[in-house]
Design a protein with these regions (language model features):
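A short alpha-helix capping/helix-coil boundary motif
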Residues: 110-113, 263-266, 302-306
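Catalytic-core regions of glycoside hydrolase
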Residues: 236-250, 254-256, 274-291
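Long, acidic, intrinsically disordered low-complexity segments
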Residues: 270-285, 324-327, 332
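Active-site clefts of carbohydrate-active enzymes
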Residues: 289-317
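Substrate-binding/catalytic cleft of secreted carbohydrate-active enzymes
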Residues: 185-196, 254-279
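Non-catalytic accessory regions flanking glycosidase/transglycosidase catalytic cores in CAZymes
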Residues: 2, 6-177, 182-184, 188-234, ...
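Short, contiguous strand/loop micro-motifs
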Residues: 119-120, 195-196, 272-273, 311-313
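Hydrophobic alpha-helical scaffolding
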Residues: 271-275, 312-319, 379-386
Length: 510
């Protein structure tokens, strides 16, 4: 298992199918909805986005005046969660006044060409936090704010947290302290010396949390925000929760399905096949969170680490991956997910100014704008727009606030199936990840329905970077989206649905 697969929850779950490949012949399938088998309620703020904290070094980005970005956030979710963190958060500093001195830039030992961390500092001024407050008010979203742990001090973190809490108030969900600390001792990171480990992390983390709490008694925290170590997440809950009590509200970790982009083994076929071996880790984390009355949130991830792979992360394949992955996490009890993205300048800075996806792009380098995996294209000087992965998130958003229902069977090759009920309407998502082989689905239920409609998630091909639609409608740069329903005949309480290869449907039953 590589460092990005510990939360590889694209595996089968009780209400989802386990991908066994992406090439499957047409095989009729019967699915029964078990409405008496109710699961968890999907939180209304399940959907989220993750950005580099250094994006705040340009205060106009997250502001109420960034109209197209506000519109696309609101379209994606009326109550989503923005997470600010990433590698750049370890090199950001709060410039409270013009006289506030910058911290010393940490330079790790060894060859900087092999180091994947930023090599410069990013100043965050009060004006950026003020603008961020307006952005959150305009979108209806709340925030997870990442504090610099790798190259800062408890006193600096406390001063920054005090201003953030004062300005954001109830819009602030919790603070995270540090980003991917399980990688600190590696040469690619270099934030801590070799041999530094979990016990060192907890001791230092608690010093930061106590300093923040002394300045901000109402502060709440989440962690450990690891890259790959599920055991760190569980140990963090077990060891830190008793010390912090109600101040700790969430366990968090990251997940990237594939990577790096210049590895020839990273393919669309492998992305959509999923990784069933890691579902057990996800369930273990949820159990640990439940034991301490915490939530578990996947706070940073996407289809392929180190910026994404062209022709996969920026293509329709990512739409299907996102829809299936988000619904799988929901079915396993995850309280939310934040897919990473943003301006290519800050994504590249967060990788030590490396961008391996460009090697794959070759002469097609303009397609790298914003990073290949970003849900929303926001390159400087350009109008924002919804990328393919955004549409998969849009499908999953329909389940926000719904109560999950059991489905039988639990497995069906490359077809992912998810059911839920919201306000008397049953939702059924079917994601056909096969590259060829349409599926004919016979739907039955233990309750009667008289009306059925559906929206289809479609694209010209798995590698298509344009032409993606959900409900026969694209999302405009102004956030306009007008889905059109397709009626389905209901006969004796059952219905037939055709799900073409490389597509998904969302069915509404009432």
């Amino acid at each position: 298992m590589n460092r990005r697969t510990f939360l590889g929850i694209t595996a089968c779950a009780t209400t989802a199918a386990c991908a066994q490949g992406v090439r499957e012949q047409n095989a009729p399938l019967s699915i029964r909805i078990r409405s008496e088998h109710q699961g968890r309620r999907v939180p209304r703020n399940f959907i989220g986005l993750s950005y580099e904290l250094a994006q705040l070094s340009e205060p106009a980005f997250f502001s109420a005046q960034h109209n197209d970005l506000v519109a696309l956030f609101r379209r994606l979710s009326p109550s989503g969660v923005l997470r600010l963190g990433g590698n750049t958060s370890e090199f950001c500093w709060f410039q409270a006044t013009p006289e506030t001195p910058a911290p010393k830039l940490h330079t790790p030992p060894g060859d900087l060409g092999q180091n994947w961390m930023p090599h410069r500092l990013f100043a965050i001024q009060p004006a950026a936090i003020d603008a961020l407050a307006g952005f959150l008010d305009a979108t209806g979203w709340t925030l997870i704010y990442g504090l610099n742990f790798g190259n800062s001090t408890p006193a600096r973190a406390a001063a920054e947290a005090a201003y953030v809490q004062q300005k954001l108030g109830s819009r602030l969900n919790f603070f995270q302290i540090g980003n991917e600390p399980d990688l600190y001792q590696k040469a690619s990171n270099g934030t801590r010396p070799p041999g530094w480990g979990f016990d060192d992390y907890v001791r230092e983390w608690l010093a930061f949390a106590d300093a923040v709490s002394a300045r901000v008694p109402e502060a709440r925290f989440g962690g450990p925000d690891t890259a790959a170590s599920s055991d760190w997440v569980i140990r963090f809950g077990n060891e830190v929760a008793p010390k912090l009590g109600k101040r700790l509200v969430a366990l968090s970790g990251h997940y990237y399905a594939e990577g790096p982009p210049n590895d020839p083994r990273v393919t669309t076929e492998r992305l959509l096949a999923g990784n069933p071996a890691v579902a057990e880790s996800a369930r273990a984390i949820v159990r640990a969170a439940d034991a301490h009355n915490l939530i578990y949130r996947m706070t940073e991830g996407n289809s392929c680490y180190r910026g994404g792979k062209p022709g996969m992360s920026d293509a329709f394949a990512a739409s299907l991956w996102a829809a299936d992955y988000l619904m799988t996490l929901a079915s396993l009890g995850c309280a939310g997910i934040n897919l990473h993205g943003g301006d290519s300048r800050f994504l590249s800075a967060g990788l030590g100014d490396h961008n391996p996806g460009l090697e794959v792009a070759g002469n097609n380098k303009p397609s790298a704008a914003n990073g290949f995996y970003t849900p929303i294209a926001t390159e400087r000087g350009q109008v924002a727009g919804a990328r393919p992965v955004y549409y998969g998130m849009l499908l999953a958003q329909e389940f926000a606030g719904a109560t999950l229902l059991g489905l039988e069977p639990a497995q069906s090759g490359s077809l992912g199936a998810y059911g839920a009920e919201r306000s008397g309407t049953v939702l059924l998502a079917l994601v056909n990840k096969a590259s060829f082989g349409d599926r004919d689905i016979h739907i039955m239920s233990d309750r009667s329905f008289s009306r059925a409609t559906l929206w289809r998630l479609t694209g010209p091909g798995l590698d298509a970077t344009t032409g993606v639609e959900f409900g026969r409608s694209a999302v405009s740069s102004e956030g306009a989206w007008n889905p059109r329903s397709e009626p389905l005949p209901v006969r004796n309480g059952a219905l037939q649905i055709a799900v073409p290869a490389a597509s998904a449907v969302l069915v509404f039953l009432s």
